[in-house]
Amino acid sequence: MPKYYCEYCDKYLTHDSPSVRKSHTIGKVHQQAVTLYYKQFEAEWFKSQMQQKGGQVPMMPPFGMQPGLLPPNMVPGQFNIPMMPPGQFPFPPPPGQPMGGMPPHQQQPMSFNPHHPYPPPHLQQSAQQFNSNSPPSNNDQ
């Protein structure tokens, strides 16, 4: 069975299964090895910046910020406008609509359409009574 090699820790894991790799990458020894690995490149970058600037200390980004990254509530191309939560719109809903979005689907009440050739079954009797009470037309004579 092939073994998994961790380049940060410079060691082989006993098994090549996702659970073993996950538990290794969560571990304290691996986290420290990754931190040391990237600190090495940070020191090299600092030295190269010192040489390019002629001895001046380069500007470091504020604590917690990485160059080129936006804060988590910012969208590229917007000016200090926080992102909206999912499912919400940046404008208010039309009058009569709730704030949460579209209302649930509601069925329209059934009504009798006098122009429809056949009324619903529960209204057939009332339609027959309506027709019997109406005055006779010229075609009936």
From Swiss-Prot:
Keyword Translocase (UniProt): no
Broad class of where this protein is predominantly found: nucleus
UniProt-annotated stretches for the region Disordered: 69-141
Keywords: Metal-binding, Nucleus, Ribonucleoprotein, RNA-binding, Zinc, Zinc-finger
Biased composition (Low complexity): 100-110, 124-141
GO molecular function: mRNA binding; pre-mRNA 5'-splice site binding; U1 snRNA binding; zinc ion binding
Zinc fingers classed as Matrin-type: ranges: 4-36
InterPro entries in the cross-refs: Matrin/U1-C_Znf_C2H2, Matrin/U1-like-C_Znf_C2H2, U1-CZ_Znf_C2H2, U1_snRNP-C, Znf_C2H2_sf
One GO CC term, this protein: U2-type prespliceosome
Comp. bias regions, Pro residues: 83-97
Listed GO biological process terms: mRNA 5'-splice site recognition; spliceosomal snRNP assembly
Disulphide-bridged cysteine pairs: none
Compartment(s): Nucleus
Alphabetized HAMAP family for the sequence: U1_C
Function: Component of the spliceosomal U1 snRNP, which is essential for recognition of the pre-mRNA 5' splice-site and the subsequent assembly of the spliceosome. SNRPC/U1-C is directly involved in initial 5' splice-site recognition for both constitutive and regulated alternative splicing. The interaction with the 5' splice-site seems to precede base-pairing between the pre-mRNA and the U1 snRNA. Stimulates commitment or early (E) complex formation by stabilizing the base pairing of the 5' end of the U1 snRNA and the 5' splice-site region.
Similarity field: Belongs to the U1 small nuclear ribonucleoprotein C family.
Subunit annotation: Component of the U1 snRNP. The U1 snRNP is composed of the U1 snRNA and the 7 core Sm proteins SNRPB, SNRPD1, SNRPD2, SNRPD3, SNRPE, SNRPF and SNRPG that assemble in a heptameric protein ring on the Sm site of the small nuclear RNA to form the core snRNP, and at least 3 U1 snRNP-specific proteins SNRNP70/U1-70K, SNRPA/U1-A and SNRPC/U1-C. SNRPC/U1-C interacts with U1 snRNA and the 5' splice-site region of the pre-mRNA.
Name of the protein this chain belongs to: U1 small nuclear ribonucleoprotein C
Organism: Heterostelium pallidum (strain ATCC 26659 / Pp 5 / PN500) (Cellular slime mold)
Gene encoding the protein: snrpC
